[in-house]
Amino acid sequence: MTQDYKATLHLPATEFPMRGDLPKREPAMLERWEREGFYAQLRANAAGRPLFVLHDGPPYANGQIHLGHAVNKILKDIIVKSKYLAGFDAPYIPGWDCHGLPIEIAIEKKYGKVGVKLDAAQFRQKCREYATEQIDLQRRDFKRLGVIGDWDNPYKTLDFRFEANEIRALAKVVDNGHLTRGVKPVHWCFDCGSALAEAEIEYADKVSPTVDIAYPARDPGAVAAAFGARLPAGVGVAVPIWTTTPWTLPASLAVSLGAELDYVLVEGPADRGQPRWLVIAEALAAKALARYGVDAVVVHGHAKGAALEQMLLNHPFYAEREIPLLLGDHVSAEDGTGAVHTAPGHGQEDYQVSRHYGLLERYGAAQINPVDGRGVYLPSTPPLGDTALAGLHIWKANDVIIDALRGTGVLLAASKMEHSYPHCWRHKTPIAFRATPQWFISMEQANLRADALKAIENVHWYPSWGQARIAGMVDGRPDWTISRQRTWGVPIALFVHRETGEPHPRSTELLRQVADRVEQGGVDVWYTLDASELLGSEAADYEKITDILDVWFDSGVTHEAVLPDRGLPKPADLYLEGSDQHRGWFQSSLLSGVAMDKAAPYKQCLTHGFTVDEHGRKMSKSLGNGIEPQDIMKTLGADILRLWIASADYSNEMSLSQEILKRNADAYRRLRNTARFLLGNLHGFDPLRHLVALDQMVLLDRWIVHRAHALQEKIVAAYARYDFAEIVQALLNFCSVDLGSLYLDVTKDRLYTMAEDARGRRSAQSAMYHVAEAFVRWIAPVLSFTAEELWSYLPGQHVDNVLFATWYDGLAPLPADAALTSADFDKLLVLREQVAKVLEPMRANGAIGAALEAEITVAADAQTAARWQPLAEELRFLFISGDVTVTAASTDDIFVSAQPTTKAKCVRCWHHQASVGSDPRHPELCSRCVSNIEGPGEQRRWF
């Protein structure tokens, strides 16, 4: 080459870095956002817009954040940011759940239980300090994820104002008639020393003993007569029960049957030499008798369970205790014997059926529930023959009771079985039902269950199956046990009558007065309060309740304790948490909301799945497959983590591994490189001076704006329905196919070789400007740091941050009367693929080195040929080939052929043209390049 024409080319130039270097750049951006008060600016910029309130479910203030936290917070952040771009004011107030047992345990490990080194007030203060420290640690990591919010003013359930508002919320619940007190069986953790709510229970496999125990009939002849049978002399009758909790037998007060179940009177094993007939459900008789070593089923009569109602049995080892036969809906013929031993102190159904029959009034509290809060039998528990039970822990009592019953004739069978059993979610230890005095929110007393089920129907659930799931849980759940016998929490600030146990008739008024004091001095005010200050002369007749509220009540009333205080409306637009929260926060919020306002506290409810490894296994330290968000941010950056979360199907389990992270890093590079190429080609472009109107653009440029418009409509709709995976996929496809494989490739010629200010070049830059303006907004909710960086490099005048803008309004579809319609472009792109297929073997066999060395002939039917012939001169730019000829042929198909060109190559544009050398001043250039350098420049209409 005799002359160097490089200086005449307009090659891409940008300072936007090729490498993201996110672990270094992101912290600097965070510092700037913090320094400039970014969240406050964002809210101020959005003032006056319609509100969209995503109410934050509070994480527990204990321990470092994990991957599940990151998923939750980033999903929320994507939604909040997309709402700002959609023209909303979307305040985000993060919160923390600060009371409860895990924090108590942490303080107990250091200082011992209350009363050892610290009194209750000092203990609560240490809990408060610990929770505050944990919040600071978690807040730092949440901010590092790129999550925007009012981090300087979060809501915390330990704040005096919140604690006061929680007591005010309780007053509304009381006022509406939902609070009740009673001795009921509740889930009890012996390690916690407290009742547990449904949401605090998880199920795990446990090996339990199974026993079949015979309850002898007091009047065997009467039982036989109910079956239409005559009992021979010397034959006994018994009703066997099957249970996995032998420890509950000392509390057994009845045996329940199914009213409509069919029972048979069958010959059973002898009782120490005496013949014995047994009452067993017909469907279970053969199986039960086989357990007892009886092969043949010899039936002496049939009867419905209802025929045996109120007949009396003997307790298997407390002979003086008469055991009535009751009827219960909970009895089935699925397993066991069809007869259920009934201990009202240790089971919900047992309690209900016993209450129905008035059984509870016949026995004292120690007989109904002989087990204390540590899981030990009370001193008053009678012995089993010569075997003492008092002081024995129930888990040890199982084997002791079984051994003591051997040889007595009542133990028909004993074995072991593994089954799913409720455990404490904190201690991972088995729990038990214990009847204790507790405070409940009744599901029936003021129609809470029916109202809640109705409210569920008015909520939009994502995914849709969430509606049936939570409805099933609410429909079948027991009353909500809201009292806890612990120290660190919000007190149930009620005064109850010393004799009747009834709450003071002015309870709601008194609760509000207590709340006013708590707002000034915290919950300690309740414990130091002299009752006479509020009750005057009545104080001697009343005592203060020292139980605290369930932590699920704490978080469940945040809609009442937080939103009105912050000037935000109820119900919130959206609650978003993990799928376990149908039985947790979603449900506690629903029940409290309906109890207070007869409405759900949210309009929409979205759930996400749990994180697992690439094999679908739960992440854990023991498996060594855990991936911490902090490590991802240190090595790859928060935007890579955010991209993975957005691209995953969060409605199911979300798989993560190093390989998956690598794939997301590759996808990120594709997006970043696209942005960099756009910026590089916008070098020297000023939209105020150079922007070409849409109707004046080269048609290929107009087409890419059309494609961007269609994509934006798709993206905006997907953000609105929270389908982030579709957005990521659509973006990557647009970058790879529409831009990477086509538009950016085709327009290089115009951008590089045309005169700097040529309309064809400015047209391409204008299209790229429109695409870049839209692109930065599309990625902003997901790739927050990268979008901010890209925003700072865009040409033209802009607001300070991309989130101060809204979805880009500079895009538009191709008009229906365009010289080339969208359908025309679709056909041309199919033709372009045909050309590529024809050229591929020519490249392979060495006939050509590049597509520019091939001349193309397109043969089509007359109508198609006539449509495309005006484009023929520019089709070579679309195909990035040598000259293109379009001919009419008598065929319905389109045929493409190619041959190597014999024309000289222009050293500047690399096209092979007959005009190369036609200008003696530039013997190595084609006439087009000469015109672009020195003349008026070429004109383009199509491509």
Swiss-Prot record:
The cofactor remark states:
Binds 1 zinc ion per subunit.
> What is a GO molecular function of this protein?
tRNA binding
For binding ATP, which residues are annotated in this chain's numbering?
A: 621
Major site of localization recorded for this protein: cytoplasm
Show the catalytic activity.
tRNA(Ile) + L-isoleucine + ATP = L-isoleucyl-tRNA(Ile) + AMP + diphosphate
> What family is this protein classified in?
Belongs to the class-I aminoacyl-tRNA synthetase family. IleS type 1 subfamily.
Which InterPro entries does the entry mention? Answer: aa-tRNA-synth_I_CS (IPR001412), aa-tRNA-synth_Ia (IPR002300), Anticodon_Ile_BEm (IPR033708), Ile-tRNA-ligase (IPR002301), Ile-tRNA-ligase_type1 (IPR023585), Ile-tRNA_ligase (IPR050081), M/V/L/I-tRNA-synth_anticd-bd (IPR013155), Rossmann-like_a/b/a_fold (IPR014729)
Q: Where in the cell is it found?
A: Cytoplasm
Q: What gene is behind this protein?
A: ileS
Q: Give the PANTHER family listed for this entry.
A: ISOLEUCINE--TRNA LIGASE, MITOCHONDRIAL, SOLEUCYL-TRNA SYNTHETASE
SUPFAM superfamilies, per the entry: Anticodon-binding domain of a subclass of class I aminoacyl-tRNA synthetases, Nucleotidylyl transferase, ValRS/IleRS/LeuRS editing domain
The written remark on domains in the entry is:
IleRS has two distinct active sites: one for aminoacylation and one for editing. The misactivated valine is translocated from the active site to the editing site, which sterically excludes the correctly activated isoleucine. The single editing site contains two valyl binding pockets, one specific for each substrate (Val-AMP or Val-tRNA(Ile)).
UniProt keyword Ligase present: yes
This protein's species is Xanthomonas euvesicatoria pv. vesicatoria (strain 85-10)
State the UniProt keywords alphabetically: Aminoacyl-tRNA synthetase, ATP-binding, Cytoplasm, Ligase, Metal-binding, Nucleotide-binding, Protein biosynthesis, Zinc
Please explain the role this protein plays, according to its UniProt record: Catalyzes the attachment of isoleucine to tRNA(Ile). As IleRS can inadvertently accommodate and process structurally similar amino acids such as valine, to avoid such errors it has two additional distinct tRNA(Ile)-dependent editing activities. One activity is designated as 'pretransfer' editing and involves the hydrolysis of activated Val-AMP. The other activity is designated 'posttransfer' editing and involves deacylation of mischarged Val-tRNA(Ile).
Pfam families the UniProt entry points to:
Anticodon_1 (PF08264), tRNA-synt_1 (PF00133), zf-FPG_IleRS (PF06827)
This chain's protein is named Isoleucine--tRNA ligase
- Which GO cellular component term is one of those annotated? cytosol
Enzyme Commission identifier(s) = 6.1.1.5
The UniProt annotation places Zn(2+) binding at 906, 909, 926, 929
The coenzyme or cofactor needed here is: Zn(2+)
